[in-house]
Curated annotation (Swiss-Prot):
Lineage per the UniProt record: Eukaryota, Fungi, Dikarya, Ascomycota, Pezizomycotina
Name of the gene this protein is made from: dbp2
Entries under PANTHER family matching the protein: ATP-DEPENDENT RNA HELICASE DBP3
Residue spans of biased composition, Low complexity class: 25-34
Class in the EC hierarchy, top level: hydrolase
Binding-site residues, ATP: A174, E175, T176, G177, S178, G179, K180, T181
Assigned protein family: Belongs to the DEAD box helicase family. DDX5/DBP2 subfamily.
Main subcellular location: cytoplasm
Protein name: ATP-dependent RNA helicase dbp2
Chain location of the short sequence motif Q motif per the record: 130-158
Organism: Aspergillus oryzae (strain ATCC 42149 / RIB 40)
Source taxon at top rank: Eukaryota
């Protein structure tokens, strides 16, 4: 089945020219075996032996996004002057309304949107679809979707697919874990298969920008899975790892590039790729990218892409900075919002907020873990305010017999990937993280989130606890709140009230007497490493190499 007479790729990776085009020569892409998923971001085969640990790594700079935040990035990129009349034409409108969708009354459509707390803005917005068949995807896409066992589209997919397939610029606002990745991935696959083949030296057709390497790798996994039948090649471009494999992928040619902004600009400045062929641009977690200071890099990257592209922007929130970005780079966009536009937490999450002093935190954390880990299937993600505290808490837990590991921006990429895999598989069901991971981690079955330190703002609180209660499941979020956090009390109570959660009387008192006193931080014990981790070798920082204490707690 071909789409609007475009270029079709069947199971044998053959291509048939359906006319149009404008790009020279139908480059065959050379690789009869297709592409297994883009090299960079894969797992590991070997174990990590060796005796002891070498005391951790020196500071690597970086923070969120692994060193992507460099203010002079992009200075070497030339400003592009676009003459749309001379650019090759491309297809971007593929949506044909299914008869069942067309025959629904407006009342039925309104009730469907109301049921899923869905609001839309813009002109000539297509109606939502209720089944995968109604979306009108080609068979090669539908077969992959059905093979995954999905029963029906999520709310954001129901409305997002018709919008994206129509070729319009799209803004989607939905909570993390709502299925938004597939909302843009499947239309991207259709878009690619309607374009002329890549010629030698061409850059990607689809570019996905993401704030963190963890999220980028997760997006790559989805693209790989659903692009498999049509041999779509991809690569993941992010900092903190050697550039060689990424350069190799780009030079061979990939239809999809998933990237963090800093490393992509590195590649562009070095001439390792170009964005001349990009006709489908995705900004995923746009709010997070702006929070992390990537706006200048995003603007430089977009300046290298033809202005008549299709742009899809996805975000969990809709602050004024994101609205401005949409206004600057999207044309006549249509928008879908799932849930309230006010900052709110997932109602499937039970939120427990305890007002504590700093010196009480460790004992209270242990008591909660004892209860949580009574069920061996549970997983707990613990958030701390700093990398230092993350490492201290991890050592403390491991020495107390708990199978905890930590992840943050100063860990080498190899170690971060290993920790994530240990957590996902349940081998280490407790993971300690900083905010660098608060939106980048996609582990579907996290049952508990524990905020050891309260975040700097309410948006980060909502995103942190959103790691649990995903894909329709229920979850529990436990938060330690101190007098040092009192300025955040009013916003937190608003979120708790909206979600109909119980409120600690001491928290309510902080709101009444807002701004209450300081109360210095209780001193943290210096849980220095004890040397000689078991079989972990010098590949791991001291906190993750600390041996489990003799009193195994799990």
């Amino acid at each position: 089945m071909s789409y609007n007479g475009g270029y079709q790729r069947d199971q044998r990776d053959s291509y048939r020219n359906g006319g149009g085009g404008g790009y020279s020569n139908g480059y065959s892409n050379g690789n009869s075996n297709g592409y297994s998923g883009g090299g960079s971001g894969g797992g590991y085969g070997g174990g990590y032996g060796g005796g002891g640990y070498g005391g951790g790594y020196g500071g690597r700079g970086g923070g969120a996004g692994g060193g992507d935040r460099m203010s002079n990035l992009g200075a070497g990129l030339k400003k592009q002057e676009w003459d749309l009349d001379s650019l090759p034409k491309f297809e971007k409108s593929f949506y044909k309304e299914h008869p069942d969708v067309a025959n629904r009354s407006q009342r039925d459509v309104d009730e469907f949107r109301k049921k899923f707390e869905m609001s839309v803005q813009g002109k000539n917005i297509p109606r939502p679809v209720e089944t995968f068949d109604e979306a009108g995807f080609p068979q090669y896409v539908l077969s992959e979707v059905k093979a995954q066992g999905f029963e029906r589209p999520t709310a954001i997919q129901s409305q997002g697919w018709p919008m994206a397939l129509s070729g319009r610029d799209v803004v989607g606002i939905a909570e993390t874990g709502s299925g938004k990745t597939l909302s843009y991935c499947l239309p991207a696959i259709v878009h690619i298969n309607a374009q002329p083949l890549l010629a030698p030296g061409d850059g990607p057709i689809v570019l996905v920008l993401a704030p963190t390497r963890e999220l980028a790798v997760q997006i790559q996994a989805e693209i790989t899975k659903f692009g498999k039948s049509s041999r779509i090649r991809n690569t993941c471009v992010y900092g903190g790892v050697p550039k060689g494999p990424q350069i190799r992928d780009l030079s061979r040619g990939v239809e999809v590039c998933i990237a963090t902004p800093g490393r992509l600009i590195d590649m562009l400045e070095a001439g390792r790729t170009n964005l001349r062929r990009v006709t489908y641009l995705v900004l995923d977690e746009a709010d997070r990218m702006l929070d992390m200071g990537f706006e200048p890099q995003i603007r430089k990257i977009i300046s290298q892409i033809r202005p008549d592209r299709q742009t899809c922007m996805w975000s969990a929130t809709w602050p004024k900075e994101v609205r401005q970005l949409a206004s600057d780079f999207l044309n006549d966009y249509i928008q879908v919002n799932i849930g309230s536009m006010d900052l709110s937490a997932n109602h499937r999450i039970t939120q427990i907020v305890e007002v504590v002093s700093d010196f009480e935190k460790r004992d209270k954390m242990i008591k909660h873990l004892e209860k949580i880990m009574e069920n061996r299937g549970n997983k707990c993600l613990i958030f701390t305010g700093t990398k230092r505290i993350a490492d201290e808490i991890t050592r403390f837990l491991r020495q107390d017999g708990w199978p905890a590991l930590s992840i943050h921006g100063d860990k080498q990429q190899q170690e971060r990937d290993w920790v994530l895999n240990e957590f996902k598989t349940g081998k280490s069901p407790i993971m300690v993280a900083t905010d660098v991971a608060s939106r980048g981690i996609d582990v579907r079955d996290i049952t508990h989130v524990l905020n050891y330190d309260y975040p700097n703002n309410s948006e980060d609180y909502v995103h942190r606890i959103g790691r649990t209660g995903r894909a329709g499941a229920k979850g529990t979020a436990i938060t330690f709140f101190t007098t040092d956090n009192s300025k955040q009390a009013r916003d937190l109570v608003t979120i708790l009230t909206e979600a109909k959660q119980q409120i600690d009387p001491r928290l309510a008192e902080m709101v009444r007497y807002s701004g209450g006193g300081g109360g210095g931080r209780g001193g943290y014990g210096r849980w220095g490493g004890r040397g000689g981790g078991r079989g972990r070798g010098g590949n791991y920082t001291a906190s993750n190499a600390a041996p489990l204490g003799g009193n195994r707690r799990w």
